């Protein structure tokens, strides 16, 4: 390829990473230009996705392209090079807030229909649903996942260990999960013998056949699953666990993944809320229905709805809700100071973030009195809950992990083409009546998989195509060979879906030379125990997992090792030949935005962006023959190492170095590395003046960046902030701006 293909697409997303991008993008372009590299942007923020979904409601001047769909097509091109930052996986509450903000800016979007009745309302709701939950990743992830802690970051964590609370063998913290009636115990699976088109239907006891999904096209070799969770068993489980927590005096917490599992987990969440506040719902249920209360969206939804009632009625309802707490366990808090509980919103406590944080804190979460306490962590679905209990058991026996000595656990994740549960949203349903749920071949009428379900049960179909499985096995072998680490496939032979995968893994491993490699297949609990026993001895182990465990483990282990998952290197080798580079494995940090608005200090650490950019440049250099890009990559890696060694990352404290200052130091170190490299004298000459200007102005720039802190700022919105105001806030150093401008003139 020629250097004409030297293009990087940098995503514009949400919250803290979007703010950091406003400062970092001009730096990237300054360094990329001399190497002939174009840096384009693609706005996939929740606001842009909403606007892209409703062009027919906008004026010509307001219309924006459907950038997510366009970027999805780009992932299918062999020269794709995409840097993907964390974005909001919008809950219903967040989506409504974003819609209202856009409406307030003059966009005449339709209101979000919470209880759609007419065909028009149902159509609008369907369009909005495409913007909800994890709407971005399934579109872009056309490859499997390779996530690991870069060597420089791991070494920094060893030299500068983050805090880890002590574990006590007397800790009462534990995980509670269902032992029957959940998806694990209600799963059937098969591998398709040929291409098929199937429909999902319910043969009701009433004699009525309801087609829930008329058509899904499947390929030969694809693994499909039919699984259901019993509403009755779920509610009985909640009753038992709430009562147990109350009797034993341990704090109660509920951990779901309502952002990614945007259909099933809000339902699972809502049942718990209703049972916890049963007496209040029994007394006011009819009124709540009239108001359109939907506790699948949390107690915040209930409080919003009752705000329209007379004050006396509001007070009565609140008294009845508070009265429920008298015979209920203490609830874990999201924000003790503000009285925000675990039940406030389903996306406030997300399992892959909340469980590692709890384990890091010695098995404790915050109570209403602002103190850390032992906790019952309720995770209804047993499929993956047991891995957390295994880690808790390990910590109770061995104590807390030591970041100075512990090994590392990279991950190779089966992710491509909406693999497994994370691709099941459009195939997940609440059973409208008792009956038999069938997956039926449209052409022949053959019933492929069948389940007996009851009203309110959650039934879903999952799928994973054969090509991604082959690619996943290949990636695991490659990483094991390149790293010298043992690789463990976390697969449970007693789970039907994973038993089908085990057959394929054993078959496709034969396609590779595995001589001298340590590759094993273990059930999740055994794999966790094996990995932890190595970790505490300072040994490294690759986890090779399905899509959900990819998500969970790439938060769990990095938070133990590094203190955060945002510092992970996350590479998605796209199956069409391109590459996508995700900046870390964490979220988009709304609290960082709050601090910026209140104090003009952004604590977001762009280390993930620095590392992703280096790999992106290296890949671009290899694939296009652009030697200058390779030099940029090597020098950026060196600059990032220097940044860590000199401790120039952002501080959480206002008045100290923040994201903007950290980015300045990265730019200065990068320019210095380029000015001293000798491989390309022309590049050396181009960057030498920039390196000198930045070094000479270090004191002035750092002073200008510090001077603006400590005062509130206006960025003109939250989901749709004003670009000009954001730029003014994020680029406050006139000296730095002038130097960058002169370098690209």
Predicted regions and their residues:
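Short, solvent-exposed positions on alpha-helices
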Residues: 630, 681-685
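A glycine-biased, small/acidic residue-tolerant capping/turn segment at secondary-structure junctions
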Residues: 702-719
């Amino acid at each position: 390829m020629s250097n004409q293909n030297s293009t990087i697409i940098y995503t514009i997303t949400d919250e803290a990473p979007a703010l950091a991008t406003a400062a970092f993008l001009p730096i990237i372009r300054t360094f990329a230009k001399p190497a002939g590299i174009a840096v384009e942007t693609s706005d996939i923020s929740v606001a842009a996705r909403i606007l892209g979904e409703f062009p027919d409601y906008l004026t010509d001047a307001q219309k924006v392209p459907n950038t997510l769909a366009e970027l999805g097509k780009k992932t299918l091109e062999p020269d794709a090079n995409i840097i993907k930052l964390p974005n909001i996986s919008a809950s219903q509450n967040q989506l409504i807030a974003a819609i209202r903000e856009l409406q307030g800016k003059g966009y005449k979007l339709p209101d979000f229909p919470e209880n759609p009745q007419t065909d028009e309302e149902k159509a609008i709701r369907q369009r909005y649903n495409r913007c909800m939950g994890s709407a971005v990743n399934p579109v872009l992830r056309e490859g499997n996942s390779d996530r690991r802690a870069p060597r420089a970051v791991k070494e920094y964590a060893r030299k500068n260990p983050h805090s880890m609370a002590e574990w006590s063998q007397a800790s009462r913290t534990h995980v509670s999960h269902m032992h029957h009636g959940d998806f694990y115990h209600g799963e059937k699976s098969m591998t398709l013998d040929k291409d098929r088109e199937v429909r999902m239907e319910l043969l009701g006891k009433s004699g009525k056949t309801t087609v829930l999904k008329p058509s899904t096209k499947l390929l030969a070799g694809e693994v499909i699953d039919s699984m259901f969770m019993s509403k009755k068993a779920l509610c009985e489980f909640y009753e038992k666990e709430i009562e147990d927590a109350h009797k034993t005096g341990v704090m109660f917490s509920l951990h779901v993944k309502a952002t990614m599992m945007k259909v099933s987990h809000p339902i699972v969440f809502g049942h718990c809320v209703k049972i916890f506040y049963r007496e209040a719902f029994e007394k006011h249920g009819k009124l709540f229905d009239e108001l359109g209360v939907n506790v699948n969206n949390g107690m915040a939804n209930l409080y919003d709805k009752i705000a329209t009632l007379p004050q006396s009625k509001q007070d009565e309802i609140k008294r009845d809700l508070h009265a429920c707490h008298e015979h209920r366990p203490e609830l874990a808090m999201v924000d003790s100071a503000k009285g925000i509980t675990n039940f406030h919103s389903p996306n406030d406590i997300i399992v892959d973030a909340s469980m590692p944080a709890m384990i890091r804190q010695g098995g404790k979460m915050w109570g209403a009195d602002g103190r850390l306490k032992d906790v019952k962590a309720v995770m209804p679905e047993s499929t993956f809950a047991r891995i957390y209990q295994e880690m808790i058991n390990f910590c109770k026996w061995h104590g807390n992990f030591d970041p100075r000595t512990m090994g590392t656990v990279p991950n190779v994740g089966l992710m491509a083409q909406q693999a497994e549960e994370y691709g099941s949203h459009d195939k997940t349903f609440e059973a409208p009546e008792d009956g038999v749920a069938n997956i039926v071949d449209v052409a022949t009428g053959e019933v492929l998989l069948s389940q007996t379900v009851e009203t309110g049960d959650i039934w879903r179909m999952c799928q994973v195509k054969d090509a991604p499985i082959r690619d996943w096995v290949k990636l695991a072998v490659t990483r094991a060979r390149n790293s010298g680490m043992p690789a463990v496939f976390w697969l449970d032979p007693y789970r039907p879906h994973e038993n089908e995968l085990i057959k394929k893994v054993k078959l496709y491993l034969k396609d590779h030379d595995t001589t001298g490699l340590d590759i094993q297949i273990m059930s999740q609990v055994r794999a966790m125990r094996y990995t932890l026993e190595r970790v505490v001895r300072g040994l490294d182990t690759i986890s090779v997992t399905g899509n959900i465990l990819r998500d969970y483990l790439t938060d769990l282990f990095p938070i133990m090792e590094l203190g955060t998952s945002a510092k992970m290197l996350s590479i998605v080798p796209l199956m069409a030949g391109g590459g996508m580079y995700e900046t870390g494995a964490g979220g988009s940090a709304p609290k960082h935005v709050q601090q910026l608005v209140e104090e003009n200090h952004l604590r977001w650490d762009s280390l993930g962006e620095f590392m992703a950019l280096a790999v992106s440049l290296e890949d671009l250099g290899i694939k296009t023959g652009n030697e200058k890009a390779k030099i940029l990559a090597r020098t950026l890696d060196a600059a990032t190492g220097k940044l860590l060694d000199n401790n120039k990352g952002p501080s959480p404290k206002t008045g100290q170095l923040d994201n903007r200052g950290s980015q300045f130091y990265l730019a200065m170190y990068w320019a210095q590395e380029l000015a001293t490299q000798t491989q390309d004298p022309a590049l050396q000459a181009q960057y030498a003046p920039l390196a000198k200007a930045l070094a000479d102005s270090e004191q002035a720039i750092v002073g200008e960046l510090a001077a603006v802190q400590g005062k509130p700022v206006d960025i003109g919105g939250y989901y749709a902030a004003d670009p000009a105001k954001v730029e003014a806030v994020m680029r406050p150093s006139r000296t730095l701006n002038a130097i960058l401008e002169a370098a690209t003139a």
